[in-house]
């Protein structure tokens, strides 16, 4: 059985490898209500207790307006963790599905949510935004870029958005989706089920299914892809500080 301590240890390694947290940071955690954003919040709140670089946390939910999504459990969790929480009601669902009737609603919805997040976190004095993208998300995004665009591309572990003056960090990149789900269940986190009609019908789901099929014959296919992303090196991905140390040691031995 996993523990929050062990889980947070892996998160810390990712944070350290990519220099995600600096002293005095006020980090907004983007909380969708899904398992990944909640385990990210739990891990960062735990890490905050002993991390050598003092930092503050704040939870922010952009409520897109889909019916039946109750965030009261998330609010209670934040209260118990001593993390300020803000839920921002929006009409994103109405704009995307009713007014615009987008053929690709996920893209516009994502942009609008990110814009609302950036605005809210700046209003609350936050300088960094922690997102719940994990190991599997990174591999899937890379494969989507390859299969659908013919490019080798993925979001970065740390991204500075100059127009918004916001630094995005992704501390869960060393955590697999199943481990995240297991810990969320073990801790009985207040997961809010998405009622979006596009859930599990996207191009991302197609790639997820493809990787699942490949992993039957090649069980470590996701790890191989992730390793390739760090070794290319893909912009912003590698080598990590730990790998630089190992490289220097190998050169000394030679």
Predicted regions and their residues:
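ATP-dependent adenylation/nucleotidyltransferase module used to activate substrates
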Residues: 1-143, 148, 178-186
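Conserved active-site and cofactor/substrate-binding residues in soluble primary-metabolism enzymes
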Residues: 6, 112, 175, 202, ...
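Catalytic subdomain that performs nucleotidyl-dependent activation
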Residues: 56-57, 136-216
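Short, solvent-exposed coil/turn elements at secondary-structure transition points
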Residues: 63-65, 91-93, 161, 174, ...
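Short, basic, helix/turn surface patches
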Residues: 110-122, 158-164, 211, 215-230
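The feature marks non-catalytic terminal segments
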Residues: 189-254
């Amino acid at each position: 059985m996993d523990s929050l301590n062990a889980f947070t240890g892996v998160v810390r390694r990712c944070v350290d490898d990519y220099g995600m947290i600096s002293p005095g940071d006020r980090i907004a955690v983007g909380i969708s209500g899904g398992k990944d954003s909640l385990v990210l919040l739990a891990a960062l709140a735990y890490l905050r207790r002993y991390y050598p670089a003092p930092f503050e946390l704040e939870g922010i939910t952009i409520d897109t307006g889909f019916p039946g999504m109750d965030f009261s459990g998330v609010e209670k969790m934040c209260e118990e963790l001593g993390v300020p929480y803000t839920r921002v009601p929006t009409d994103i669902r109405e704009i995307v599905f009713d007014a615009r009737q987008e053929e690709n609603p996920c893209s516009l919805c994502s942009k609008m949510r990110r814009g609302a997040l950036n605005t809210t976190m700046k209003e609350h004095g936050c300088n960094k935004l922690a997102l719940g993208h994990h190991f599997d998300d990174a591999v899937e995004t890379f494969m989507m870029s390859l299969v659908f665009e013919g490019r080798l591309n993925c979001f970065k572990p740390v991204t500075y958005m100059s127009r918004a003056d916001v630094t995005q960090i992704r501390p869960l990149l060393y955590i697999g989706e199943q481990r995240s789900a297991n810990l969320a269940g073990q801790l009985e986190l207040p997961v809010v089920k998405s009622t979006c009609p596009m859930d599990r019908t996207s191009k991302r789901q197609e790639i997820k299914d493809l990787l699942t099929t490949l992993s039957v014959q090649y069980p470590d296919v996701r790890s191989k892809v992730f390793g390739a992303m760090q070794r290319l090196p893909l912009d912003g991905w590698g080598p990590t500080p730990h790998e630089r140390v190992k490289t220097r040691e190998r050169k000394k031995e030679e």
